[in-house]
Amino acid sequence: MEEKKVNIRIASPEDAEKLLAIYAPYVEHTAITFEYEVPSLLEFRERICHVLEKYPYLAAEVDGQITGYAYVGVFHDREAYDWCVETSIYVDQSCRKMGIGGKLHHALEEVLKLQGILNLNACIAYPEEEDEYLTKNSVEFHRHLGYDMVGEFHNCGYKFDRWYHMVWMEKMIGEHRSGQDFPKNFPQIREEAESILSKL
């Protein structure tokens, strides 16, 4: 079977309905996210707008249809953490095993390098034993992308009447040095980011 091309572009608030349709099953049927209730369309649109003020929010398309998305958020509020972000990737559950998540992450990483981000951090739900709500696949996915496990919190997430662990994984994408320039906000490098995404 011919592999379909995955196009990565910058998401917009107008994509909120389609992106929310991808996210909702993760809330309702998995422990991949510890969120209990599916956010409203308005709230989800506001989340996209908030991210884009500072960071990239990317959408993957196959044959013109959105099949996944990726974005980052603030790791911690204090200024000394500005070079660190927390990553999130969600792929339409009917489109898994197509390499979409990996391509989204690669694109995200390239844009974050433009901004001057150095540390990628992933907060991942992790089961003691795999069940119908949560597997260990996300940890393996991140290992494949070059992340290392750096911490584990035990029984800190309660969903579907079960307790789950949470792990932190990290990946360094830049050089840590003295005299470090502060990262740029996404709008400052958006045009350059669009150029890079068009070539991926």
Which residue stretches match the model-derived regions?
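Conserved acetyl-CoA-binding loop-helix of GNAT-fold acetyltransferases
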Residues: K97-K113, T135-E140
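A short beta-loop-alpha structural element at the N-terminal edge
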Residues: N7-L19
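Conserved GNAT-fold acetyl-CoA-binding loop/helix
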Residues: L20, A24-R47
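Conserved catalytic-core motifs of GNAT/GCN5-like acyltransferases
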Residues: C123-A125, V139, R143-R162, G174-E175, ...
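Acetyl-CoA-dependent GNAT
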Residues: P39-C84, S88-S94, Q115, M172-E175
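Glycine-rich phosphate/pyrophosphate-binding loop shared by adenosine-nucleotide-utilizing enzymes
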Residues: V6, Q65-Y69, Y164
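A short, internal acetyl-CoA/4′-phosphopantetheine-binding micro-motif in the GNAT/acyltransferase core
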Residues: S88-R96, I124-E129
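Conserved GNAT acetyl-CoA-binding A-motif
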Residues: L112-L134
